[in-house]
Amino acid sequence: MALKGRALYDFHSENKEEISIQQDEELVIFSETSLDGWLQGQNSRGETGLFPASYVEIVRPGISTNHVDYSNSPAGSLGTQGSLYSSPSMASPARSGGGSGFLSNPGSFEDDDDDDWDDWDDGCTVVEEPLAGGLGTNGHPPLNLSYPGAYPNQHMAFRPKAPLERQDSLASAKRGSVVGRNLNRFSCFVRSGVEAFILGDVPMMAKIAETYSIEMGPRGPQWKANPHPFACSIEDPTKQTKFKGIKSYISYKLTPTHAGSPVYRRYKHFDWLYNRLLHKFTVISVPHLPEKQATGRFEEDFIEKRKRRLILWMDHMTSHPVLSQYEGFQHFLSCLDDKQWKMGKRRAEKDEMVGASFLLTFQIPTEHQDLQDVEDRVDTFKAFSKKMDDSVLQLSNVAAELVRKHVGGFRKEFQKLGSAFQAISHAFQMDPPFRSDALNNAISHTGRTYETVGEMFAEQPKHDLFQMLDTLSLYQGLLSNFPDIIHLQKGAFAKVKESQRMSDEGRMAQEEADGIRRRCRVVGFALQAEMNHFHQRRELDFKHMMQSYLRQQILFYQRVGQQLEKTLHMYDHL
């Protein structure tokens, strides 16, 4: 039942799923159950969407004091009754696609992947996974339920210091002895755990099993190359069934070059890996998986399209110096035994080095980098990525429109031209004494040739434009990751500047300010290494894309020319 509410503070939406509200604005709230600190409702302008639960109060009719106030509820709490990390039963609506309307998405849980995990894993492997692991890049549960959560499980729900040592943000703000925390708890800088890392609240681990090195290269910081490079092919998408044919799915054959045997994986296995990657690698642009669909998902064209895009996805994964070394990825590529698979799956889901803790795994160069120079480089890359994103979208739209013309308009026009030539040939046969069979046959053949050319145009996108669209789609996903990653670095810069100002004013020890600057260097080196890797891959991928497109275009028009030249020779000896 809809309830009336009142906005306690102003809130400005950052994406289409959220709506802006103003202080004292009257709201309609669809449900008083807060999930991950967000409510769904309607503002006074008739806009429907999400807004922070802590920014509103629910007004009960006739009882002015009896209302639910979320203003002290942290993001991730269920109203005033839940803790910071909800139990699995509370998280179930988000994972099942049911419950409140803003969580349901008919396109996210589709036939090929909506069955139980019993054929892959007989039980729930991480029952203590926090609800925060399901947060989206905007702080509320997105429709695809994918977010790199800052903390791995409920039992290490981010305890940076003992209770007596912990510096509460409000108390520390009053004392003015430490850098203030971001009051916007929905900021990805906060939710990712990077703020806590910068402020020194992420505890060092006694033993860190994995490390990733950054070194200085000719273009600045870069990831140290994988000492054991490899590739992986994806082949033979095969339709399989279970439950006596009631459910069906597509299985892909994966053959890594560094493993002895191929493995077979379904799309939902890829999806599991993808969410592990998002959960762990906070400052890395993880390539998006190709979309899944329910209607017609076993049609040949869709199967081929998904295969092409999974191949590109795998190519980017294996070429990334950090992602390719991830233990969960290696397990995904090589495990053949069911029992070992489940053990490795549980181990990946209980990984402690995720989110904020993942930043502890970096080994950075000793070279000094001026903070302003780094910020300038980040700003340049931000402008570049925005322009590239716009350009990729423009080229994608043009290429998609060209595909439609090839399949529809071009074929139709050439067929009309061919039919018109055929009509001329038939007309010439109407007066037998004056008809020329050789000429009529040549004109009729010309008509058939243009009909063939029309079919060639309809088939051509499979050889060039489809591959171009696949590459552009991959880069649209990669580019869409960078705004949040850059926001993390911007937040780190701000903390360094604030700490230095407080140190200059005598409100913070210089040693503490130096620690913040040192940890900011870690984030800065990681972002620059990721920017460097993106540029390297971009140059290779777009070179290959353009070469492939032009070669196929040349071959296509050569084939068209051969058809026309063959027809032309029929007129030589009339």
UniProtKB/Swiss-Prot annotation:
Alphabetized UniProt keyword annotations: Cell cycle, Cell division, Cytoplasm, Cytoplasmic vesicle, Endocytosis, Membrane, Mitosis, Phosphoprotein, Protein transport, SH3 domain, Transport
Question: Record keywords: Cell cycle included?
Answer: yes
Family matches, as InterPro entries: AH/BAR_dom_sf (IPR027267), PX_dom (IPR001683), PX_dom_sf (IPR036871), SH3-like_dom_sf (IPR036028), SH3_domain (IPR001452), SNX33_BAR (IPR037427), Snx9_fam (IPR014536), Sorting_nexin_WASP-bd-dom (IPR019497)
Q: Where is this region: Disordered?
A: 79-116
Domain (SH3) spans 1-61
Q: Name one GO molecular function term.
A: identical protein binding
Recorded GO cellular component terms are: cytoplasmic vesicle; cytoplasmic vesicle membrane; cytosol
Using the record's annotation, list all stretches that form the PX domain: 230-340
**PTM note:** Phosphorylated.
GO annotation (BP), single: endosome organization
The record's subcellular locations are: Cytoplasm, Cytosol; Membrane; Cytoplasmic vesicle membrane
Q: Quote the function comment for this protein.
A: Plays a role in the reorganization of the cytoskeleton, endocytosis and cellular vesicle trafficking via its interactions with membranes, WASL, DNM1 and DNM2. Acts both during interphase and at the end of mitotic cell divisions. Required for efficient progress through mitosis and cytokinesis. Required for normal formation of the cleavage furrow at the end of mitosis. Modulates endocytosis of cell-surface proteins, such as APP and PRNP; this then modulates the secretion of APP and PRNP peptides. Promotes membrane tubulation (in vitro). May promote the formation of macropinosomes.
Q: Which family does it belong to?
A: Belongs to the sorting nexin family.
Listed under subunit, the entry gives:
Homodimer (via BAR domain). Interacts with ADAM15. Interacts with FASLG. Interacts (via SH3 domain) with DNM1 and DNM2. Interacts with WASL. Interacts with FCHSD1 (via the F-BAR domain).
What's the protein here called? Sorting nexin-33
Organism source for this protein? Mus musculus (Mouse)
